[in-house]
Amino acid sequence: NVSAEKLHGDIKSNVGALMSGIQQGGVVEIKKTTQLAGLVVDSVVRNPDAFSWLSRIRDKDEFTYGHIVRSAVWAGVFGRHIGLDKKDMNMLVSGVLLKDIGKVKLPESLLTLDEKSRSPEQEAEYRCYVNYGVDTLKATSGVPAEVIHIVKNHCERFDGSGYPQGLIGDKIPFLAKVAGIVTTYDAVTN
């Protein structure tokens, strides 16, 4: 029985190790990520309130790490709320844990700018992180296609205003829509 606080710490350290490994040219440890996703789902199923409130605590760490952790928790909570089965919840949480791995290939100066401060050229370069992440996952054996679809499409928006493809409505995979909702929710509330 893993406490929510310990699990939150485990996720945070795993995300840090994941990003560091990719930065150093390593591969994604999909087995470890999948295990953590399963623990998040189990924790949310057992006690959704404790885990979701814990995720609201502002981390003093770099924003991306905190955002990934909080978004993964919200993915589990929201997935449970809308009645996803355990397999889909695991895919959703895994995808959210991995959604930003492509950012390690962007210059740090670009990551410190908020969306409104970026020039059109900088915004175009920033948006490449999605494809960088997809390429990294495709080069890693054992990553489920559903997880790759979530990473690839989590920035798409129902009205077609998202990226990288500008997909509209039902062209966006369902779990990617859910990932987009929870990551936007976390970004707006933090």
Task: Please provide the spans of the model-predicted regions.
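Extended, charge-enriched "interface" segments that sit outside catalytic cores
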Residues: 2-8
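Histidine- and acidic-residue-rich, metal-dependent catalytic cores
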Residues: 11-190
